[in-house]
Curated annotation (Swiss-Prot):
Gene expressing this chain: ligA
Chain positions recorded as NAD(+) binding sites: 30-34, 79-80, 131, 165, 280, 304
Originating organism: Aliarcobacter butzleri (strain RM4018) (Arcobacter butzleri)
Name of the protein this chain belongs to: DNA ligase
Domain BRCT per the UniProt entry, residue ranges: 573-648
UniProt GO cellular component terms: cytosol
Stored NCBIfam families: dnlj (TIGR00575), PRK07956.1 (NF005932)
Pfam families reported for this sequence: BRCT, DNA_ligase_aden, DNA_ligase_OB, HHH_2
HAMAP family linked: DNA_ligase_A (MF_01588)
């Protein structure tokens, strides 16, 4: 076979593979495909340097791993802000319009699958990482290479992250479950679970057989210079990625609503599961000005489909005790299939909600579920009552430790700090992904260790030894070593992660970062006045933090001595023209807006997204637009990029 013949045969193989795996429309028999693939493979083995970068032979599974290793995203994979109705959408647009009143919106289908980040360097697929906690995920590169809708090589040579959703088509999902039923295996609940499970197979042969599909929805780190998000996406599709159906630009809320309702009308006919529509501000400069909250970009939202309603029956109420002692009622209902998954429990929030609904055991009720939202009861059919309904009473004692509870109306609390449920849930929270991220220390393992009297509090995690675990059910050598290594790896974590992991009421990730940056290790000794003086730190937060430290200070001190956390040093900014000044950036400059923003913040400036009388400087480049005009109108001092640089 000559090189020219080989290239032609590879193009034919790629065409056949795409027809089968991507478009579900085979144009060659298995025998024809296998025969040609073997011929090409023989050529590749003899001429490895001449092999085609996207040869289907490079996608074949065969690698079996012991486990997945952790890998970091180059830039964070953010969550999406959810909106559920027209009013919430209007509110989101109103917030975005404060930066730019002339908005265009890039709308695309929201696929219900498993998020994946592809890292290409010099045009080669180097790594594929699951979302994980948004910062660190799992390396599934070998499995990603078996997915035919993921190019192994692209023409873009700069370092770039291309992100999307791994899904399974509904028809393929049905075939997989039929096969699993024949083999006596547990069925997948829905296509999303099947896609996520298939992507995380240790044996890439299994992944290769599942006909996974990759839908691009965005990018992470990149050096592209397009001014519109829609232009970026068109470029990404030109690199060999599939373009989703019904992706378009909208100029106003009416056009967005029209497209959204089209999605709703065809969602059941769509070949893949959808759970909404993603809306993004199209202008890149506006995206940069809007920036991010702690959880999601302000320039993007997910317009979720309406919740699916079903009728079921309330069988019982289970009481759950959280780490702060709050007792939450959970509805146990007759198992009901909703939107592809079986629901047997629903949230009730608190006992005020039970009283508002006038809910009784044995009532027939309406239960709703939408995507990831926890199912909840919205209505009781009073007219269907038969007389065997049982009134639900507010608890007077803790269901776990039997201590007397404090009933504050909306909240009912167990005040016993040694309550087993409080202790277990505090340990679970401490070890969770968004806190200390101790892989292998999930809910069931924590409960097992607590029940076996191996741990009694957070500190005991760090005293665990091999011999403590070797006789426990389900613990083998590898599992024990992995857990002990995961615990050891938390040592040297940032101080704010440790404080956040303590689960102090009203003190979340943002507040933890703020107080740790301000006070360092001395944070545990701070009084009310010191805390309340911080910007955005309210009375409730300060009182909660002080009370927690009063009760648990000894434990926290020991924990800090064991973990020896990293302390971020607050930079002391020397006097300069930008210190404590409010600055607005507009227009195109030689450096990116993000770089300039970072430089100014390092100098002690507050970079704002809008011009007002309180603005000290507006720094402008080419195509400055309305912010430049507003600065002139208000008499705000204007600086060119050169003038700004001269002040550094």
């Amino acid at each position: 076979m000559t090189k020219e013949e080989y290239d032609l045969n590879i193009e034919k193989l790629i065409s056949w593979a795409n027809a089968y795996y991507v478009f579900d429309n085979p144009i060659a028999t298995d025998e024809e495909y296998d025969k040609l693939a073997r011929l090409c493979l023989a050529y590749e083995q003899e001429n490895p340097k001449l092999s085609h970068p996207n040869s289907p032979n490079k996608r074949v599974g065969g690698i079996v791993l012991d486990g997945f290793i952790k890998a970091s995203h180059l830039s964070r994979m953010w969550s999406q802000e959810d909106v559920f109705n027209t009013q919430e959408l209007e509110d989101w647009i109103k917030r975005a319009s404060k930066v730019n009143t002339n908005l265009e919106f890039f709308c695309q289908p929201k696929f219900d699958g498993a998020s994946l980040n592809l890292i290409y360097e010099n045009g080669i697929l180097k790594q594929a990482i699951t979302r994980g906690d948004g910062t660190v995920g799992e390396d599934v590169t070998n499995n990603a290479k078996t997915i035919f809708s993921i190019p192994l090589e692209i023409e873009e040579k700069s370092l770039i992250e291309i992100r999307g959703e791994v899904v399974i088509k509904k028809a393929d999902f049905e075939k997989i479950n039929i096969e699993r039923a024949k083999n006596g295996e547990q069925l997948f609940a829905n296509p999303r679970n099947a896609a996520a499970g298939s992507l995380r197979q240790l044996d890439s042969n299994i992944t290769a057989k599942r006909k996974l599909f990759f839908n691009v929805w965005g990018i992470g780190q990149n050096s592209l210079e397009h001014k519109k998000y829609s232009q970026i996406m068109e470029y990404i599709y030109s690199l060999g990625f599939e373009r989703p159906q019904m992706q378009t630009l909208a100029s106003n809320i009416e056009e967005i609503e029209s497209l959204y309702h089209k999605f709703i009308s065809i969602r059941n006919d769509f070949e893949m599961m959808l759970d909404g529509m993603v809306i993004k501000i199209d202008d890149i400069e506006t995206q940069e000005e809007l920036g991010y909250t702690v959880k999601f970009p302000r320039w993007s939202c997910a317009y979720k489909f309406p919740a699916v309603e079903k009728t079921t029956k309330l069988k019982a109420i289970t009481l759950q005790v959280g780490r702060t002692g709050i007792i939450t009622p959970v509805a146990e209902v007759e198992p009901t299939l909703i939107d592809g998954s079986t629901v047997s429990r629903a949230t009730l929030h608190n006992f005020d909600e039970i009283e508002r609904l006038d809910l009784k055991i044995n009532d027939e009720v309406i239960i709703i579920k939408s995507g990831d939202i926890i199912p909840k009861i919205t209505k009781v059919f009073f007219e269907r009552r038969k007389g065997d309904e049982i009134t639900i009473s507010r608890p007077t004692s803790c269901p776990t430790c039997n201590s007397e509870v404090l009933d504050e109306g909306t909240m009912i609390k167990c005040q016993n700090l040694d309550c087993p449920s409080r202790v277990v849930n505090s340990i679970i929270y401490f070890a969770s992904k968004n806190c200390m991220n101790i892989d292998g220390l999930g809910n069931k393992i924590v409960e097992q260790l607590f029940n076996e009297k191996k741990i009694y509090d957070i500190l005991d995690i760090y005293s665990l030894k091999y011999e403590d675990l070797q006789d426990l059910e389900g613990f083998k050598e590898k599992k024990i070593n992995n857990l002990l290594n995961a615990i050891e790896n938390t040592k040297g974590s940032e101080l704010h992660r440790v404080i956040n992991a303590l689960g102090i009421e009203h003190i979340g990730e943002v507040a933890s970062k703020q107080i740790c940056l301000e006070f360092g290790l001395d944070v545990i000794n701070k009084d009310y006045d010191s805390l309340i003086a911080l910007d955005g730190f309210g009375e409730q937060m300060a009182n909660s933090f002080i009370e927690f430290m009063r009760v648990n200070k000894n434990l926290v001190e020991k924990l800090i001595s064991i973990i020896n956390p990293k302390v971020e040093i607050k930079k002391e900014v020397s006097e300069n023209p930008f210190k404590n000044k409010t600055v607005v950036i507009t227009g195109t400059m030689s450096k990116s807006r993000g770089e300039i923003k970072s430089m100014l913040e390092d100098l002690g400036a507050k970079v704002s997204s809008s011009v007002s009388k309180k603005t000290d400087y507006v720094i402008f480049g080419e195509d400055a637009g309305s912010k430049y005009d507003k600065a002139i109108e208000l008499g705000v001092k204007l600086l060119t990029e050169e003038e700004m640089n001269s002040l550094f």
